[in-house]
Amino acid sequence: MINDIISDSLTRIRNAGMRKLETTKLLHSKVVEALVGIFQAKGYIESFNVIEEDKKKFINVVLKYDEKGKSVINELKRISKPGRRVYKGKDEIKRFKNGYGTIVVSTSHGVLANDEAYKAGVGGEILCTIW
């Protein structure tokens, strides 16, 4: 049984990128679907789709690589964990890695990237960082 589906999903994406796999399959949840939606919008993955196998839902993620075959994801890190939650206000999430990275925030408006959360004027739980 998996206690933290977000950490599991991030680890699967990170490991698939290191092994240069074309796709990886994640367990489905609404938060993970929103998370990979942000990754796709920001250009860190090619695409994703929700599939159903034996009455269980999964998310199939197609990874993205540069022209040299290197994963476009340099670092993917879980910040807020079940044993230690991390919350930040809107002013603390404005920029990450001088604008080259993204902070994914769970807010009252849903799961948002840091620039969207800043524009909406909301803070929240820092789920992960990616660059």
UniProtKB/Swiss-Prot annotation:
Cross-referenced PROSITE patterns: RIBOSOMAL_S8
Family annotation (InterPro entries): Ribosomal_uS8, Ribosomal_uS8_CS, Ribosomal_uS8_sf
Regions annotated as coiled coil: none
GO terms under cellular component: ribonucleoprotein complex; ribosome
Pfam families according to UniProt: Ribosomal_S8
GO biological process, one term: translation
Keywords: Ribonucleoprotein, Ribosomal protein, RNA-binding, rRNA-binding
Any one GO MF annotation of this record: structural constituent of ribosome
Function, in words: One of the primary rRNA binding proteins, it binds directly to 16S rRNA central domain where it helps coordinate assembly of the platform of the 30S subunit.
Assembly mode: Part of the 30S ribosomal subunit. Contacts proteins S5 and S12.
Family: Belongs to the universal ribosomal protein uS8 family.
Descriptive protein name: Small ribosomal subunit protein uS8
